[in-house]
Amino acid sequence: DIKKFFASVDHKVLLSLLKEKIKSENILWLLEQVIHSFETEKGKGIPLGNLTSQIFANIYLNELDKFVKHKLKIKYYLRYADDFIFLSEDKESLLQYIDELKKFLENELKLELHPKKINIRRLDNGIDFLGYIILPHYILPRTKTKKRILGKLKEKMGSENFKQSLQSYLGYLKHANAFKLSRDLKNHFLL
């Protein structure tokens, strides 16, 4: 995980990457207006949840993807937004990758790995990714995720958009082996 990714995107780096790909001065001007319309600190930050921010994030982190695949030559790598994992049979290799990744992020993209979210674990303990624990034959929602879902639903109970929230969480749980939890949520909140 990258520490405060959306708040830390460097405008100069992002614009430089866009200029490599886009030749139209008009489009570049428009994108520059969008980028400079939001700042968390001088010259940094893109708004969380904005459609353009999702595109900008993928363009920005494509540099990370290329570094991981072509320079580090990590065979098993997966990224979704600013969350990513890579796998190796060798713990020493993982530690070396992390060290090189930190340097690349700081020097090239002006980003920082979140120190509390670096996690080295055995594959048979599952992969903790995007709120799920992914195991060889099944996927579970993370305990913290289950607690957060329950808390959010209790907060929204009786609100106008409660059913939408419940349906959204049930949709999220469909990607996991969480039949019992889904059934319990329906029974508890819909009765």
What are the residue ranges of the model-derived segments?
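Conserved polymerase palm-domain catalytic core
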Residues: I2-A81, I85-L101, L105-E108, E112-R121, ...
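Right-hand nucleic-acid polymerase module
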Residues: S37, E92-D99, L113-L191
